[in-house]
Structure formats: C-alpha cells, structure tokens
Amino acid sequence: MAKQIQAIRGMNDILPTQSPLWQKVEAVLRASVAAYGYSEIRTPIVENTDLFKRSIGEVTDIVEKEMYTFEDRNGDSLTLRPEGTASTVRAGNEHGLLYNQEQRLWYMGPMFRHERPQKGRYRQFHQFGVEVYGIGSADIDAEVLMLSARLWEKLGISEHVTLELNTLGDPAERAAYREALIAFLEQHKDKLDEDSQRRMYSNPLRVLDSKDPQVQSILGDAPALMDYLGEESSQHFAQLRELLDAVGIQYRVNPRLVRGLDYYNRTVFEWVTNSLGSQGTVLAGGRYDGLVAQLGGKDTPAVGFAMGLERIVLLLETLELTQDIPAAVDVYVAAMGDSCLVEAIKVAQELRSTLPTLRVMSHCGGGNFKKQIKRADKSGAQVALLIGEEELAEGVVTVKYLRNDNEQQRVARNALSAFLAELTK
C-alpha cells in the first residue's frame, strides 16, 4: 500500500462534523457586518513581500520569523499573507477606493504564519476582519467596538470576554515615549530576558507586552504613555470612553496594551477571555492612520480589527455552546426497491424546489431496508421518507421519525410539502 500523505504541520482540515459550527460562526459574522452596512472585499492569498515589510514592520516577529516567503520563477519575492489589513489597504489604493472616500469593509479568509502550532493557533488560520477608511473621529472607533460586542452577543459569549483599551498617541507622541522607555529599559538591561533585550531598541513598546514575570515587575516603574499624550490624543481617547460608557460597553484601560504590528496609533484594543488559558486574546485591533500613505496612498485615517476563527470555534467548544448546531440533513429519502427509485428521486427534487431551505438527502447505492434506515439515522435527519411499492400504488409516503418515539405515519404525496413545512418550522 502506498504511503499516505499527511497535512502539513499546523495546517488542519475542517471535517464535515466540524463545518456546521464554522458555518454558524461565519453566518453570525456576515449578518453582523451587514447590519452595520459594511461591504466585503476579497484579496489574493499571495502578495509581494515588500507589502508586509513596509506595513507590518521589518523588525516585527511576523516579518523576521513567521512569514511564508518564496521566489517565483521570475525572481520576485512573494509571501502568503500573514494578516488582512495590509492587503486591504493595497487593494484600496490600487483601485481608488480610498481617495477622498469613506469605506467600511470586511474580509474573511485563510492567513499563514510559520509559528509554533498550539491549540487554537495554527500555521494556516482563518481570519475575519473589519476595516474603516476616511473617518478620523472617535465615534467610528466606538462603532467598530460596538460591532465587535454585537458578535459576542450573537454568538452567546458576551459574559466570557472582556474589552481592554489603550491609546498609543500620534507618531510624534509615540516617538517621544519610545525614547523615554528605551532610557528606562537601559537602566535595567541586566534584568531583561533575551527577547526583551533584543526588542529594546528595535521595538521597545513590545517589551511592555512581555510575559516574563521579572520584566513585568520592572515595568511597574516604567514611564506611562498617557503622560506623553497631547491634548488632541487625550481628547480622542476620552471621547471614545464616553461613547462606550453611553452605550453600556464595559472596558478596562490597560496602559501596557500594545499591538504587535508597527502601523498602529492612538486607539488600540483587545477582547480577551479567561476560558482559553494563557492565549486569551480572541479579537484585536486599533487605529492605523498612517498606513494608507505609507503604502503609497493619500493620508487617510483608518481603524479596524481582526479575529481568528479557530479561536472563536475553540471558545464555543470549550464553553459547550455547540449543542444547537443543526445536522446537515433534515429529511432522508429512501426507496424500498429498485422499482421505486425514480419516484424517490422525484420526491426529493420536488421538496428541494417547493421547500428551498429544507435539506434533503436521497439514498443512493441500493441496499436493504435496514441498511437504508441506518444511513438515514447516521445522516442526522429528523425524518426518513420511505417509498415502497405499496406507497407508490397508494400515492403516499411513509414518514419515519428518527429523533423521537413518534409512530411512523403515511402522508399523501400531494400534501407532503405542507406537512414537512409544518414539521420543520
């Protein structure tokens, strides 16, 4: 027997038993962004490597360690997209979507990062994101946070996630704070772990996010970013908090919250959970007003967020909130004998036409009564429709209940659609 080829480590199949939960999550996401008037954008999986070097930052972990980068036959450096924001900005600039315009966009699709696989975090993962362009005021920051809160409500996990909020100021304020932070870290360099020492000059704000307990104890005396904010940034952050208070969205200001990508400014946020261990972030985002110009467009304010679907699916499974996921089939149609096969196929086709939301599976491949009922039960259907020679002669269908103890019954062929519509509503 030939050796089986396995999936690449960290890149997982989503099997038929798992896909209904994914479909439920995706449906909630699509319905939620539609309620806010956002439009979908789809971008290629492969982009020029420079796009991510210029946007994410060359000294970030993603660019330094995690990107899937290769040369094509023309010698061009290409990369499997590690995140969605840069591609959305590139597409917006390329097609004139962002020039003196407001855009509310969303995307969903696979991303790729070569990092250590762990539960809920994989090398191929699926990301859902929202991006808004052309609006610089705090009310749009509040809107994307309200939208994200709506997602948790619709998924039934509002009580299991909390919002953390911070501001990074504008680029000048951030630069001034960066110098003060470097000066502070230099005084404690011998107590920093290797990773923090490496980041101290290249990306010092990421040291604030260190998980090392000793580093965290040192940071208790570090300068506070809030002390370096100008009036405009302070007012922006204050207005955002006022709006969130007004609509009842609870949050915690976390002065050490920074984002791992270089392009963020002012508002940054994360939704976190205590239900998934140390890897608690389930959604993150913020404002990135300089990125559009950085990638060749006009200065354009922007804000957005992204979430990994694997994390959301894992959270729902961990919280045991998957019980209401419907089976893939509502009705299973079985022919009791070859002479009834054509009639069974006709019944299934008519039901698909008259009841388009009804999920109808036809038995194929023959087999005796016991085998067909076994397959019907395995399909997850609520009922099996049995058509034998007797039913054919009398113009009826036998309805066998598969999920309860109701006695089977016969239903006239011409009344079947109405019967099933009532049964499955």
Swiss-Prot record:
InterPro entries: aa-tRNA-synth_II, aa-tRNA-synth_II/BPL/LPL, Anticodon-bd, Anticodon-bd_dom_sf, His-tRNA-ligase, HisRS-like_core, HisRS/HisZ, HisRS_anticodon. SUPFAM superfamilies: Class II aaRS ABD-related, Class II aaRS and biotin synthetases. NCBIfam families: hisS. Gene3D superfamilies: Anticodon-binding domain, Bira Bifunctional Protein, Domain 2. The gene is hisS. Keywords: Aminoacyl-tRNA synthetase, ATP-binding, Cytoplasm, Ligase, Nucleotide-binding, Protein biosynthesis. Coiled coil: none annotated. Belongs to the class-II aminoacyl-tRNA synthetase family. PROSITE patterns: AA_TRNA_LIGASE_II. It is an enzyme of class 6 (ligase). GO terms for biological process: histidyl-tRNA aminoacylation. Disulfide bonds: none annotated. This is Histidine--tRNA ligase. The keyword Nucleotide-binding applies. It catalyses: tRNA(His) + L-histidine + ATP = L-histidyl-tRNA(His) + AMP + diphosphate + H(+). The keyword ATP-binding applies. It is found in: Cytoplasm. GO terms for cellular component: cytoplasm. Its EC number is 6.1.1.21. Homodimer. It holds the Pfam family HGTP_anticodon. GO terms for molecular function: ATP binding; histidine-tRNA ligase activity. Its main location: cytoplasm.
